Amino acid sequence: MNTLLTHGYFLREDPKEQLIMKPYPPLGLLCLSAWLDKHGVENEVFDTTFSSKEDLHQYLLEHRPRILALYTNLMTKINVIGIMRFVRSRVELRHCLIVLGGPDVTHNLEGYLAAGADLIAIGEGEQTMLEIALTVDGKRWTGDGGENRDDLILTSMSHITGIAFRLPDGTVFKTAPREKLRDIDRLPFPNRHKIDLHQYLDAWKRAHGHSAVSISTQRGCPYTCRWCSTAVYGQSYRRRSPEHVVDEIVHLQQHYDFDLIWFVDDVFTISHKWLGAFRDELQKRQVDIRFECITRADRMNRDVISILKDCGCFRVWIGAESGSQQIIDAMDRRVDVAQVRAMIQSTRRAGMQAGTFIMLGYPGETERDILETTRHLREADPDLFTITVAYPIKGTGLYDQVEAQMASTALPPWSEHTDRDIDFPRTYPRRYYDYAVRWTVNSVHWHKTQNTGRRLSVAGLKFLVKIWVARAGMVWWRVKGAYRSGSSKFILKPIR
């Protein structure tokens, strides 16, 4: 085998996702595979989602690929490192060239190269991976796993842009940046036929009674939110034509039985002109779909909501991250919280579901900001919302902001933790925010029971108990944090 594409996500190791059970296939790998196929490069995809580490190890030993390409993100870092260690430990795989790509590698070059990677593809990977594969296929690479491995990489791979590798003296070398693909209509449809997509559809069907597929229509995001990583596609905006996207939808409808589409784009309604053309193309070709997407409140209005509904949208996720304008501004979100509420409400009035995202524990956030966020959720009244506690991803503005403060945080070795494990000094201790999340969630749900006339129901009383318990936890950790810091500035005020 020439090239094997895989990743390190195993559903059986993710108890949260097992409860949610909304898995999607690795589109990035499937796009790489399709690009390689288009240019005549033999490749296979081993999808780990429904598999096991043992299955992957056995596959590697049986097929002995010349190139092992691993997609790497924050969630899969530890497993990817484990896969590399397995390859390096087996003499049968000594010729295997390990290539990493994905959002977590760009700002962690030294760590991944030290952990066993031969090459790292920085940014978009299609053309980079093609050139690596052609180099190996042309026998310019004869890696033997010996002491001269770094010399071989230097002499055979240094002509390829957009990669990083170690020089013989151990230092990390980056070639010139890879130019981004401007016309992404040139990309073939993802190679979904190389994995068992029915496993995903069946998992959805068993858990929810319907199934879903994912589609990407754009690359890059022009916004500068300080907590968000743009490590792969950068701060750009490139869009497939509406015709090309509808072609893919029709192709999927012809080959698979699914109910919903999840558009994975960061801001689906960023271009109103594109959105209108997309609707026209769907209607012209009489293509019926139901889908959900993500967007920003400032890229929505009544006309956009109407077009989304015409297209078949049933749910819109509208980013906010906070109900406090002060925190939104600190995040560089460049959106007005009142506009977020208005768009959530307008979306629901139009007959679609509205979801939103919230982040607690951002630098500078106080209990007053958390209260404003909870009030925001009560007033906006989205159908769905998710809450996370802020963590710094390397390469983001948030990471740069708190990096100096992270130095004193005790962490395991780099290869044994992810950015999610990193903490930094906040207004309150880290445990405080776990209770703040519970308080916010249950407060909003209790408010919904009031609006539906179930204030004294069993469900409403359960929410009240959870609110009191969460509030007690917030008070405890707030007082404990103030005591540890020697501060006397903690006044216990009720939250209403």
Regions found by a protein language model. Give the residues of each.
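Catalytic cores of alpha/beta
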Residues: 109-114, 304, 364-379
